[in-house]
């Protein structure tokens, strides 16, 4: 897990609209654009990899439960950046991998209710940082992980499972990324 702003780009960085031939793809809170390679100050080890990025701001319902059903989403942004993609200080890299499939498995792991419940236990503000993942165990991302797999692996009983299921909202990752 990287620190916030793994590429040395501030939250105000918006990039440029088109690739001038010497650019990386940029993800900022304003969306996608391009940034000249020489402006990227750090994180060279992540650039050629598939990256799972996590937004530093929690979902609006992280600290307080949804009024309708009492659930929380916790993570607002969870996405995959392809090789030669970078991001601003609004995100950190939750994992960097040589192939898309492994990155997808990592992304789906972070989207599980199990992981988001453990993350919620360390949140005290609207910002997520890597130290907030203190209770989240690392996995082998060569395979997919579901909540059921994790409940079994860590020996959760029915009461513990019901607590997690009642508190954490399902997370829809949308398309492939």
Residue spans of the language-model regions?
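C-terminal substrate-recognition regions of SAM-dependent nucleic acid methyltransferases
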Residues: 1-163
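Short, amphipathic C-terminal "tail helix"
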Residues: 164-177
């Amino acid at each position: 897990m990287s620190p916030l702003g793994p590429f040395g780009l501030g939250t105000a960085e918006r990039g440029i609209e088109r690739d001038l031939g010497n650019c990386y793809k940029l993800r900022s809170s304003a969306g996608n654009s391009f940034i000249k390679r020489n402006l990227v100050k750090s994180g060279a080890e992540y650039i050629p990899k598939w990256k799972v990025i996590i937004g530093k701001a929690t979902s609006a319902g992280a600290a307080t439960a949804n009024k309708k059903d009492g659930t929380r989403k916790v993570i607002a942004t969870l996405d995959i950046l392809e090789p030669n993609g970078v991001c601003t200080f609004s995100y950190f890299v939750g994992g960097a991998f040589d192939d898309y499939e492994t990155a997808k498995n990592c992304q789906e792991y972070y989207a599980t209710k199990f992981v988001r419940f453990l993350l919620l236990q360390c949140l005290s503000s609207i910002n997520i940082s890597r130290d907030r993942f203190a209770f989240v165990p690392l996995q082998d991302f060569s395979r997919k992980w579901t909540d059921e797999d994790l409940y079994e692996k860590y020996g959760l009983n029915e009461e513990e499972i019901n607590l997690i299921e009642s508190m954490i909202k399902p997370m829809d990752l949308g398309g492939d990324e």
